[in-house]
Amino acid sequence: KFLKRNTRPTFHSVILAGVYDIKNLKHRIREDREHQMNSPWNIAADFPVDMSFTVEEIEGMLNEYNDEHSCVMLVRECAKTIFEYTSGYPYLVSKICKLIDERCGENWTKQGVSDAVKILLREANPLFDDLRKKITDYPELRAMLYAILFRGESYPYNPDNFAIDIGTMFGFIKEKNGQVVIANRIFETRLYNLFLSEELTNSIIYQSGERDKNQFIKNGVLDMELVLEKFMIHFHDIYGDNTNTFVEENGRRLFLLYLK
């Protein structure tokens, strides 16, 4: 439309609002034989609007829904629990509410939210597909997320760091008290599951956990002391000859594989 602006009415200007900075977009608005540089008037302006929902905003949405549908709903409890899982990430907030409404028997309670989250973490959707694709496309981001989750490493929040900048732009990480943290519990769990699933098939510690699983529930309660005891036995048998550095770097990951 821009190239034909002299023969037909068109926009005076175009504003793009989205995830990518305009300086990272490759546009061709002229013939290939002409220069390809962006106009100096293309300005990537900051968009200082926090798109995340607060607990109060989630509560307001639930109140509106409750007024329209006359549900039995523990509004404040649901709003707080949804926020604890999502940190207000809009897609996740809406998705959890949709799952409660359609697949959890309209159980608008803390348990209903928990059930919806379990369904969400098991399903494929465009957001999680994009998460997986992005960490494949950006190995620096993947390495940082892996180190945070499994080695407990901390990274000072520095937007000049490429991995931090790209992770923030996609909404996968955020700044908290000057440090990089995973954006919300659902992303954290999904990433745990993704990284662990790549190791399950050939993991001896995982196979040991599978064999021990039936021993861990007693009278409907998880016997955590027995879990730790059994894990330490298997860990010593399998990895006892490794160095302290190996234990420090891999202990958390191996324990999660055992629990998986």
Give residue spans per PLM region.
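Short, amphipathic alpha-helical interaction segments positioned at domain boundaries
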Residues: 187-217
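Sensor-1/coupling segment of RecA-like P-loop NTPase cores
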Residues: 1-36
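A short helix-turn-beta junction within AAA+ P-loop NTPase domains corresponding to the substrate/partner-engaging
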Residues: 29-51
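Acidic-basic catalytic patches of nuclease active cores, encompassing PD-(D/E)XK
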Residues: 223-259
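Winged-helix-like regulatory helical subdomains adjacent to P-loop NTPase cores
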Residues: 46-47, 54-170, 176-177, 206, ...
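Minor-groove-contacting beta-hairpin "wing" of winged helix-turn-helix DNA-binding domains
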Residues: 179-184
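Conserved adenine-nucleotide phosphate-binding loops and their immediately adjacent elements
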Residues: 38-42, 208-214, 229-239
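Conserved nucleotide-binding/hydrolysis micro-motifs of P-loop NTPases
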Residues: 19-24, 54-58, 100, 187-188
